[in-house]
Amino acid sequence: MDHSAARLDPSAHARQPWRIHDIANDFRLEDVWALPSRGGPDDFPRLVSLIQSLDPGDSPLAVRALFVVRWQLGALLGLDRGETGLDARVDSLRTRLPEELAADTGLTFPESLPFRPVYVTDREAAFEIANTAVHAVMHLGWVPDGDGGY
């Protein structure tokens, strides 16, 4: 089994019965990646927990430097003002959720990451970010890899 990340054709995402297709159907799909992970059919919550716990402050120096530059440019250009984000410039995707997905996810992110959880199921999760430049979604899905893993 190949343990490296691989960019996929967007049709790989479109073929899945993801809930995100209905919730964010007016968003443009930028790219799709297969990321190596260990686990079985019930291990998606572990991946979500890992994503939730990411902190740029724990990253290598080069990654931390990129975050510092990004936040400084954002402050200089006014990209991240509160009035340009979620529930200000744009409504959260949570307002589009069907009742069965609308329950509080219980997830939070460190202040250093500007993502907000939209929904989590047993095999997919969506997180959103909004500022002056973008309203974007990070969607994670748990798909069998064909080699007994996910």
Model features per residue range: what roles?
Residues 131-150:
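Beta-strand/loop substructures that line and gate deep hydrophobic ligand-binding cavities in soluble
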